[in-house]
């Protein structure tokens, strides 16, 4: 048990980098478009929407270009809100999208399609890293583009969109096809480290609220940071110190050498259930209420937590790997 305890603590430190430094949770969106590409609102109003609705950070990720954020400070930035540059590297292999977000690039990005879908994705990832950015794989099930087979051989990437607001993203399993959560467990069960992101992929800020539109405010992440800065947010995302949500708010997520604990922030009279999930998507424990905990056995390979609410909202906590 002592050896297991040491291994879990080492993994927690390596993946989440916890320390005694005071931290807080900050809410943000990693995928949004403006009229600089195919969004229907100008960048300053995109920034203003997220600022006004209580977000602390936003990446504007227009297609194949970096939307300059410094000039938006007067309209976007506030004491508790920052804009971070981004770009959606928009590659295709044959008819299949291979889109990769570059979060906080330091320079313009150039990338080309490869000879396979996996190579094309890797080209986008490598281009993001060369620019000093954090790569994020976007909407794998959009047009049923790529899955765990294509993702398992990728290098230098940990973020992928588990939930994308767009109607065509096929987030859930149906018709014999795996949803994004099934892809996630398939990868984790191979011992591969991937962290789940929920994002708006916002394109539509104006007009009627019709089902086919990609409106803001439906998918987001909360990152644990010691300070609100681009570097701190990107570091938290890259090491998985965040949770993804479609509406559920968490008060805290804590992992010790003995347990994985989730504390939920209640909304109205909503009821909550937490699932602790392991290898091959196996449910290890189910617990109702605002506080849920799972005691490690030592043979799980990994443990992640999923919180779902009676109003249909969900939160996804990141996996912790356990090695004997």
Predicted stretch roles:
Residues 12-13, 41, 72, 211:
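Alpha-helical transmembrane segments and their juxtamembrane interfaces
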Residues 10-18:
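Hydrophobic h-region of N-terminal signal peptides that target proteins for export
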Residues 19-21, 190-195, 200-324:
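C-terminal functional module detector
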Residues 51, 129, 188-189, 238:
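Alpha-helix boundary recognition
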Residues 179-193:
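Short, hydrophobic/aliphatic alpha-helical segments
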Residues 11, 52, 151-154, 190-191, ...:
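Alpha-helix termination/capping residues and helix-transition junctions
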Residues 20-149, 153-156, 162-183, 199-202, ...:
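A metal-dependent hydrolase metal-coordination microenvironment
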Residues 2-8:
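Sec-dependent signal peptide recognition
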């Amino acid at each position: 048990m002592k050896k297991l305890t040491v291994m879990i603590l080492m993994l927690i430190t390596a993946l989440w980098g916890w320390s005694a430094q005071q931290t807080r949770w900050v809410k943000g969106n990693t995928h949004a478009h403006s009229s600089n590409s195919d969004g229907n609102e100008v960048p300053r109003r995109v920034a203003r929407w997220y600022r006004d609705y209580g977000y602390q950070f936003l990446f504007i990720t227009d297609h194949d270009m970096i939307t300059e954020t410094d000039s938006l400070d007067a309209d976007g930035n506030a004491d508790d809100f920052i804009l971070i540059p981004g770009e959606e590297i928009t590659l295709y292999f044959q008819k299949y999208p291979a889109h990769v977000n570059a979060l906080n690039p330091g320079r313009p990005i150039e990338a080309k399609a490869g000879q396979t879908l996996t190579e094309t994705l890797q080209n986008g990832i490598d281009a993001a890293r060369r620019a000093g950015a954090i790569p994020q794989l976007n909407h794998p099930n959009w047009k049923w583009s790529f899955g765990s087979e294509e993702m398992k051989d990728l290098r230098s990437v940990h973020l992928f969109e588990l939930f994308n607001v767009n109607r065509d993203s096929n987030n859930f399993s149906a018709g014999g096809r795996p949803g994004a959560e099934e892809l996630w467990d398939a990868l984790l069960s191979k011992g591969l480290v991937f962290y789940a992101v929920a994002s708006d992929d916002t394109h539509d800020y104006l007009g009627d609220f019709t089902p086919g539109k990609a409106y803001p405010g439906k998918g987001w992440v909360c990152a644990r940071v010691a300070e609100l800065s681009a570097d701190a947010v990107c570091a938290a995302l890259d090491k998985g110190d965040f949770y993804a949500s479609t509406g559920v708010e968490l008060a805290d997520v804590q992992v010790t050498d003995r347990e994985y604990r989730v504390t939920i922030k209640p909304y109205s009279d909503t009821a909550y259930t937490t699932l602790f999930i392991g290898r091959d998507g196996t449910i290890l424990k189910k617990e109702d209420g605002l506080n849920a905990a799972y005691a490690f056995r030592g043979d799980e390979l990994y443990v992640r937590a999923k919180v779902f609410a009676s109003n249909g909202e969900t939160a996804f906590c990141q996996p912790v790997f356990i090695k004997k």
